[in-house]
Amino acid sequence: MSSQQQKQPCTPPPQLQQQQVKQPCQPPPQEPCIPKTKEPCLPKVPEPCHPKVPEPCQPKVPEPCHPKVPEPCPSTVTPAPAQQKTKQK
C-alpha cells in the first residue's frame, strides 16, 4: 500500500505543469505586434539621413583643398629661402 501512495502524488504534478505551459501560449500573439511598429520606424530615419550628408560633403572638400595648398606652397617657399641661407653662412 505504501508504494501505491507514492505513485499517486507523482502523477498529479505533471498534469498541473502541462496546463501552465498552455496558458503562456495565448499571450505571445500580442508580442509580434510590438516589433511591427519599431521595424518601419528605424529604417525610415537612418536611410535618407546617412547617404545624403556624407556623400556630397566628403568628395567636395578634400579634392579642391589638398591640391591647391601643398602644390604652390612647397615649390616657392622652401627652395628659395633654403638656398639663400646656406650661401650666406
Curated annotation (Swiss-Prot):
Record-level GO cellular component terms: cytoplasm
Induction pattern: During squamous differentiation of epidermal keratinocytes.
Keywords: Acetylation, Cytoplasm, Keratinization, Repeat
Pfam families in the cross-refs: Cornifin
GO terms classed as biological process: keratinization
UniProt keyword Lyase, yes or no: no
Residues found modified as N-acetylserine: S2
Subcellular locations according to the entry: Cytoplasm
Sequence repeats: 3-14, 18-29, 31-38, 39-46, 47-54, 55-62, 63-70, 71-78
Chief location: cytoplasm
Region (2 X 12 AA approximate repeats) residue spans: 3-29
Keyword check for Transmembrane helix: no
Start-end of Polar residues biased regions: 75-89
Known function: Cross-linked envelope protein of keratinocytes. It is a keratinocyte protein that first appears in the cell cytosol, but ultimately becomes cross-linked to membrane proteins by transglutaminase. All that results in the formation of an insoluble envelope beneath the plasma membrane.
Protein name per its UniProtKB record: Cornifin
